[in-house]
């Protein structure tokens, strides 16, 4: 069998003859290795503490954030069955439209600390700290051969970039599944790199487990990094080809088992004794995987929750993400979320590979570039060309890859600064970052108008200093230029990320940036919009093509019952719902008592009146009420602390049937029916079944007005 020398990245794992003894594990944790500069490990801890402070500070400002997922977490604190399935309500009528892994973490936090805004979002913020640490650890290992200082500085830069990405600052303080998704994918990257020095089966199996649970977080999106991880292990693992193949097989089995156990459990569970699988057309998880959360996202199409609806001012099929194409990630919709350092990352990838040249395929630095580059290219291309519904906040999944490339490629170019390609590469990264930062900051010209000029001028002067440093007598200018250029290059993205953390984000479509700004076209930038805007499906009085998904979907117009138009879906994109023709659409709702509600019905400004709250809270029925649509039901659940039946779920699911609803009413399981207007009106529930239920209720029960809402008491027929 072919043998390999112990790589630099793993030499500390074995005692070297004559080498000084290693510090105890606790000392290494806080001080690093003996040969590390004294400031390196404290710098890491400073970065992690700073990330924790920024992401935890005023965490409750957003209330319950996305009420759709918040209601599911509340349900999980009351019912272990709801916890397991990811039910929207504690009486287990229907699930959310995603697998429940992210809910499990938040439910456990809420069970320990009590259900509140802080306990809901605490795990999300801590996942940011974990992601920063994992990116640091991954980059440091791939750069170890460059020397401990260069490796650690590159790793610190990568970790900082993750924390300073606006999309990360948004989603790691929000209750959507994306925070856990990013953490798990990053854990998979770290495990893959740990597996390389000796072709470890244990570490590559852990990578498979991480991606398996990423699948249970957001299904197929969690597997977009799989090609990069597989190629890196196959090419760079320091073991025989046979053992590499076996290792990949073990990883595949680990992935399937860790992802499939829940799918199998749901499939084997009698359908009549579990909640309906939200987002599916046939009450199965597989339909959710390959339809609503699968091909529907890629190819679009109506009748599928992943499909796009009307796009208003945008291009058909773009649904909040802008038109498809290579420039989508740089468009106003997505650019402010993720693209601040994207040009620099692409430069780092190309020139980094040039710098490593023809080294052995197992070279750790090359492996790092391939891992992060494969992650960025595959995921970025899918996001750029998918025709189904996509939202700008999805791009948070690119943050670790961009950070990894900037840290790895930047360190390689710095190490090669005595060569022309190293100096020109560093200058190019800084110059393009400064120029693109100016463009992005210019999207909000009234916000800190001086900042974009500081970024541009400072960055270009720094790049010029690096070029001037090519003169032998001015080599110190390279160091000064790199340090200053890094500072100016990170200023724009850091400022925008910090501004994002100071703004309340509630409802279904959060957005990055300072108060009053929005990254989506529907919030004021050109070329944007999603369904529900004038000229698109879901305008006033209409419905969004009969389907909306909890992550995206399109909007519905208001029905006659006074419901506001819904935003996008629970995974949506902008911090404030675009104002609709009837004037509704504030994203930051409060209840009558002034408490944050996590975004009113549909992410709009509607709230539950105290009269309706008291009425439903006093009900002892299995479901205090039934209402069309998951977002309407979610807000009622949060306000009344009761289980509410969401007719039609989020995307016009065929549940319940009229016969099932009538049977539950006859059994006294549903206390009230709260009207959402003609044909549904609330998010989801716009199906013919929902209309039939509403017509049947109106024909057999007396309508009363409670707090401005039409309510039917289902305990007394007319």
What are these regions (language model features)?
Residues 335, 355, 386, 402, ...:
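Hydrophobic alpha-helix feature that most strongly marks membrane-spanning transmembrane helices
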Residues 417-518:
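Transmembrane helical bundles and short interhelical boundary loops of multi-pass, membrane-embedded
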Residues 273, 281, 655-664:
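Alpha-helical scaffolding within the catalytic cores
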Residues 28, 66-70, 75-79, 226-354, ...:
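Transmembrane-lumen/periplasm boundary regions of multi-pass, lipid-linked membrane glycan transferases
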Residues 124, 181-183, 223, 288, ...:
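Structural recognition of the beta-strand scaffold that forms the well-ordered cores
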Residues 165, 491, 629-630:
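Helix N-cap/beta->alpha junction signal
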Residues 504, 585-589, 599-605, 610-624, ...:
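Aromatic/acidic, Gly/Pro-rich catalytic loop(s) in extracytoplasmic/lumenal soluble domains
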Residues 1-287, 291-301, 313-425, 432-436, ...:
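Membrane-integral, polyisoprenol-dependent glycosyltransferases
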């Amino acid at each position: 069998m072919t043998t390999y020398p112990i790589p630099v990245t793993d030499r500390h794992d074995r005692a070297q003859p004559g080498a000084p003894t290693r510090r105890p594990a606790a000392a290494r944790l806080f001080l690093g290795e003996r040969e590390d500069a004294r400031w390196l490990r404290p710098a890491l801890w400073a970065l992690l503490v700073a990330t924790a402070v920024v992401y935890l500070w005023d965490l409750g400002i957003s209330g319950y954030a996305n009420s759709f997922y918040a209601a599911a977490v509340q349900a999980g604190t009351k019912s272990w069955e709801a916890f397991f399935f990811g039910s929207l309500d504690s009486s287990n009528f229907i699930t959310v439209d995603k697998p429940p892994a992210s809910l499990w973490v938040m439910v456990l936090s809420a069970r320990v600390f009590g259900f509140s805004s802080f306990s809901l979002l605490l795990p999300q913020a801590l996942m940011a700290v974990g992601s920063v640490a994992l990116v640091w650890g991954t980059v440091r290992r791939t750069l170890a051969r460059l020397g401990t200082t260069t490796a650690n500085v590159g790793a610190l830069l990568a970790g900082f970039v993750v924390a300073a990405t606006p999309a990360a600052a948004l989603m790691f303080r929000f209750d959507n599944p994306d925070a856990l998704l990013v953490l798990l994918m990053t854990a998979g990257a770290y495990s893959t790199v740990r597996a390389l020095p000796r072709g470890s089966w244990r570490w590559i199996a852990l990578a498979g487990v991480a991606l398996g649970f990423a699948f249970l977080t957001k299904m197929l999106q969690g597997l977009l990094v799989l090609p990069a991880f597989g190629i890196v292990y196959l090419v760079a693992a320091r073991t025989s080809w046979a053992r590499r193949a076996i290792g990949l097989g073990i990883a595949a089995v680990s992935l399937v088992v860790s992802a499939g156990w829940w799918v199998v459990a749901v499939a084997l569970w009698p359908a009549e004794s579990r909640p309906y699988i939200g987002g599916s057309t046939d009450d199965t998880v597989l339909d959710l995987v390959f339809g609503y959360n699968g091909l529907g996202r890629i190819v679009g199409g109506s009748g599928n929750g992943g499909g796009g609806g009307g796009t208003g001012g945008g291009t058909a099929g773009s649904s909040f993400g802008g038109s498809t194409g290579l420039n989508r990630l740089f468009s106003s919709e997505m650019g402010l979320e993720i693209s601040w350092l994207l040009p620099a990352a692409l430069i780092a990838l190309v020139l980094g590979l040039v710098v490593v040249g023809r080294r052995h395929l197992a070279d750790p630095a090359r492996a790092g570039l391939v891992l992060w580059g494969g992650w960025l290219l595959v995921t970025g291309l899918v996001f750029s060309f998918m025709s189904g519904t996509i939202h700008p906040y999805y791009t948070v999944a690119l943050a670790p890859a961009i950070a990894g490339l900037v840290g790895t490629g930047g360190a390689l170019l710095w190490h090669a600064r005595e060569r022309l390609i190293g100096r020109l590469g560093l200058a190019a990264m800084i110059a393009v970052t400064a120029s693109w930062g100016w463009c992005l900051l210019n999207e909000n010209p009234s916000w800190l108008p001086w900042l974009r000029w500081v970024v541009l001028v400072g960055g270009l002067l720094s790049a010029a200093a690096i070029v001037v440093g090519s003169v032998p007598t001015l080599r110190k200018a390279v160091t000064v230029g790199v340090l200053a250029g890094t500072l100016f290059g990170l200023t724009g993205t850091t400022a925008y990320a910090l501004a994002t953390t100071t703004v309340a984000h509630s409802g279904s479509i959060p957005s990055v940036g300072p108060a009053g700004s929005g990254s989506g076209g529907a919030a004021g930038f050109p070329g944007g919009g999603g369904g529900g805007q004038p000229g698109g499906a879901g305008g006033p009085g209409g419905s969004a093509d009969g389907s909306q998904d909890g992550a995206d979907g399109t909007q519905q117009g208001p029905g006659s019952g006074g419901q506001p138009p819904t935003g996008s879906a629970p995974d949506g994109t902008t911090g404030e719902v675009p104002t609709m023709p009837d004037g509704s659409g504030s994203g930051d709702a409060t209840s009558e008592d002034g408490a944050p509600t996590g975004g009113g019905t549909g992410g709009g400004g509607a709230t539950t009146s105290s009269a309706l709250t008291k009425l439903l809270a006093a009900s002892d029925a299995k479901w205090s009420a039934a209402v069309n649509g998951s977002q309407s039901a979610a807000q009622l659940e949060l306000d009344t602390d009761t289980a509410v039946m969401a007719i039609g779920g989020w995307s016009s699911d065929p549940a319940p049937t009229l016969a099932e609803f009538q049977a539950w009413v006859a059994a006294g399981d549903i206390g009230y029916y709260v009207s959402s207007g003609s044909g549904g009106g609330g998010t989801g529930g716009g199906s013919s079944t929902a209309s039939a239920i509403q017509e049947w209720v109106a024909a057999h029960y007396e309508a009363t007005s409670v707090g401005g809402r039409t309510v039917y008491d289902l305990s007394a027929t007319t």
